[in-house]
């Protein structure tokens, strides 16, 4: 997959045939390598909609939710579950936008600097911009006192008890596809909720 993508790109360099490249449906972690290598090879924009398209929409939704809840982006804590292709881009975009604190969680728990298990290169890099307190634990631990949950992971991982442990007026973006991390019915204690189906 990586080789065929790069061969096609080399032809574009030679023929100067495109003004930009949109990558589609390339799984993590291959998508990171492909995007990085294309960025190095080409002098045109490279956009992976699974990463960047999702991140743009989530950030726009966050801005709106913060306006409704009257919270300041620099004062919030965001917990993101599922730092794959979309999750990584969401974290980077939220960091650039000035989110106060971001905590990333994967199937092994909270990402932190000294963790050994499952810390592949793109997740290790995320440790530089997330979890400034070097917190350890589970998704439930991460959600205590958090303002925002962003899920791009698996269905039914978030319980109503976890939502109740969050800060006042929590914002939930449960986007696992086809079923969200928590349903609206279970998260009805939340002020704002969205799912991939919305």
Predicted regions and their residues:
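Glycine-rich phosphate/diphosphate-binding loop of Rossmann-like nucleotide-binding domains
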Residues: 60-143
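Rossmann-like NAD(P)-binding element
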Residues: 117-176, 181
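A glycine-rich, Thr/Ser-enriched phosphate-binding loop motif common to dinucleotide/cofactor-binding enzymes
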Residues: 48-64
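Phosphate/diphosphate ligand-binding glycine-rich loop within oxidoreductases
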Residues: 15-53
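Short glycine/serine/threonine-rich phosphate/pyrophosphate-binding segments
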Residues: 31, 54-59, 85-91, 112, ...
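Single conserved hydrophobic/aromatic residue that forms the stacking wall/gate
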Residues: 1-8, 13, 193-198
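Rossmann-fold NAD(P)-binding glycine/threonine-rich loop
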Residues: 176-195
